Amino acid sequence: RQRVHAAHLRRVALGAALSKVGHTVRYGMRTPSKRPEDGLTFADAVGFAELVVVALPYGAVEEVLAPLELEGALLIDATNPLGWNEGVPVLAPPKEGSAGEQIAALTGARVVKGFNTFGAEHCAGGTIEGRPIDVHLASDDGEALEVVSDLCDELGLRPIPVGPLYRARATEQLAILWIQLAIVEGRGRKLVFSLVEEN
């Protein structure tokens, strides 16, 4: 089983789901708990992990990740570079590329973009209208992509590889659309984007 570090925003949902299927999860935080199962420093959590999940507000990414030893680490990037304009969610991308590409450049990690295009509660799997929840995955590393795809299968989710890491730009746009439809327009958090193919 993978030892996993999940950070901040989606940590409870994804961490709980991974724990439920047998993985050992530790959480990184600025102010660690006295109990390791509740939270470690970011550095200690990364040192423990075979897989790191980054689920931070994008504005905190550089501050948190830059000091960490992540070169070559397997890392899931679940961040979205989000801003708001008069109550409407807008993409606030880095100067070049996507959040996923920036995290890869910053850390030297083997980044898989994923778990960022639906509500956190869907990390635990399940179906909507009889269809599994799709997880859009972008990565330049085939082995890392395979590991994360297998995790999706374990969680009862359907991995949908969408291509190289630069495709993270598209999934981050999709996340903004999800926020607009599900939250701003009030369609509800059960809304997901599903790939439907004719047999």
Task: Enumerate the language-model features and the residues they cover.
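Rossmann-like NAD(P)-binding element
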Residues: 42-74, 78-86
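Rossmann-fold NAD(P)-binding glycine/threonine-rich loop
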Residues: 79-127
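Short, structured coil segments at secondary-structure junctions
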Residues: 35-36, 71, 107, 155
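Conserved dinucleotide-binding and phosphotransfer motif residues
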Residues: 21, 48, 155
